[in-house]
Amino acid sequence: LLYIAGLRISEVCDHTMGDFYWRRGADGKERWWLAVRGKGEKDRSIPATDELVLELMRYRSANGLPPLPREGDPLPLLLPLIGGAKPMGRSAVHELIKNVFRETATRLRALGPDHEATAAHVEKASAHWMRHTAGTHQSDNMDLKAVRDNLGHANIATTSIYIHTEDDKRHDQTSKEHKLGWMHP
């Protein structure tokens, strides 16, 4: 949810399985969506991709639930680790995510010293890092307005911070094409 849907940690904690819904598009195709009330109490609908729906089905089935949620399903998006239906709080989810990254870093280090830099990078990761990565990857291949709407940004300038590859391409192109001509190769 943090990466595939680009949700904020608060949005993961504050929403339920019943916030997933489907509707038929103008082309007749059924599409799943996730209704989110985000920052500033702004409502948005996030496309629930086929990949997200498949992972949701696997997650629910592994937890003894029917594969797809129903309208009004009160269960939290992230099921509590120790039974019950009470949603996990932000700090608990944050700590859970940090633990996953720490464990991943430990496993990377066990592969040998060649993996130390990657392990150190992963160890610093957080829930927001996953959202930021989602925004960056979406902005590489999608219209910036769609990325803005998916992430729930009020201003496209906020979404622009995720554009790295365009800046890299612009830098490379400028370096190649805009020269004084004084330097010799």
Regions inferred by a protein language model and the residue ranges of each:
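Short, charged phosphate-coordinating catalytic segments
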Residues: 2-28
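C-terminal secondary-structure termini that scaffold catalytic or DNA-interacting sites
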Residues: 177-185
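Residue-level marker of regulatory loop/turn positions in helix-turn-helix DNA-binding domains and
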Residues: 1, 37, 89, 119, ...
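Catalytic-site neighborhood detector that most strongly recognizes the C-terminal catalytic loop/helix
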Residues: 151, 155-176
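Short, basic (Lys/Arg/His-rich) helix/loop patches that form interaction surfaces
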Residues: 94-149
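C-terminal catalytic core of Y-nucleophile DNA break-rejoin enzymes
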Residues: 38-58, 73-99
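Short pre-functional
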Residues: 1-10, 33-34, 136-137, 178
